[in-house]
Design a protein with these regions (language model features):
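RNA pseudouridine synthases
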Residues: 1-306
Length: 306
């Protein structure tokens, strides 16, 4: 294992709790869980029940049965192997409360997507700092954290659309049609929640095929073309809204997804086998401009296109 990386390791497992709505009465436990957690089908949930991993109202569930509605289900997930992660970073600012780091690509900020302890949140626990927002696992750059609830609340407010904080990223994308060097382009299309076979629902661009949309969020991005190569475009992207995967989605909406993005594809399609935590793209949180408070981070060593 090279320096600056934490080896893959087993955690101690985790207990997931779900309250069952009354409307689910009569549905088998395995079927309800399979619908809620699309990564596992009913047969796999039946295996977990047989293995003694599920509780019904705090008592062991000994067999698949019909739900009554209103009960609590607990899945005691056994320990699993968490992947290796980078665990070193550059500190950009630290005044004893506010902490801003240059997060390396590949480090998850919070639990999710197969990570529980191999996260920035867990690594920061001894310092008392906690993340204010969440960069994607494979997005590098400025990650704001704070040690007190007051400072976390202050910065969370600044990150809102009317908070006055400008977040400036750089990204490598497929060529953006009609955009020339130095030109800017405004993207104000909604980020929408649409079906996904593994996750149930996922945030993405508005589909061409009329697929159902569960929710919409307004989003605003400003693009500027900094460099054009045969392989793709290097863009500066400024956002005032912080929607889930906003930059990845807006570029896919334009038909110019991030180079190497395994999830958001051409023609506004979304991969049926990838998830938001999969890497391969290049997106860097470069600058934060909060008026009198401005910070900038250096790029990863492999940022350019070879």
């Amino acid at each position: 294992m090279k320096a600056g990386w934490r080896e893959a390791a087993f955690n101690n497992g985790w207990t997931y709790r779900d309250w069952v709505p009354r409307a689910a009465a009569g549905t088998l436990v395995s079927e309800w869980l399979a619908d809620r957690y699309r990564h596992s089908d009913a047969g796999l949930w039946q295996q977990r029940i047989a293995a003694g991993e599920l509780d019904w109202n705090e008592a062991l569930l000994t067999g698949d049965r019909a739900l009554q509605g209103g009960e609590t289900l607990c899945w005691r997930r056994p320990p699993w192997l968490e992947q290796t992660i980078p665990d070193q970073w550059e500190t950009i600012h630290d005044d004893g409360d506010l902490l801003v780091i240059n997060k390396p690509s590949g480090l998850p900020v919070m639990p999710g997507g197969g990570f529980l302890h191999h996260t920035l949140m867990a690594l920061l626990e001894p310092t008392g700092a906690r993340p204010v927002h969440r960069l994607g696992r494979f997005t590098s750059g400025l990650q704001v954290c704070a040690r007190t609830p007051q400072t976390r609340a202050l910065w969370s407010k600044q990150f809102r659309p009317d908070g006055g904080c400008r977040k400036v990223y750089q990204a490598w994308s497929q060529r953006v049609p009609g955009l020339e060097l130095g030109q800017c382009l405004t993207v104000s299309s909604d980020v929408v929640e649409r079906p996904h076979p593994l996750l149930g629902w996922i945030w993405g661009p508005e589909p061409f095929d009329g697929a159902p949309i569960r929710k919409r969020l307004s989003a605003h991005s400003e693009l500027e073309l900094l460099e054009r190569r045969a392989e793709g475009d290097r863009l500066q992207v400024t956002i005032t809204t912080g929607r889930p995967h906003q930059i990845r989605i807006h570029l896919a909406q334009l038909g110019s997804p991030l180079l190497g993005d395994p999830l958001y594809l051409m023609n506004r399609e979304i991969s049926a086998t990838a998830t938001p935590g999969d890497g391969g793209y290049r997106l860097h949180a470069w600058r934060l401009d909060g008026g009198e408070f401005a910070l900038q981070s250096s790029f990863p060593t492999d940022w350019g296109i070879l």
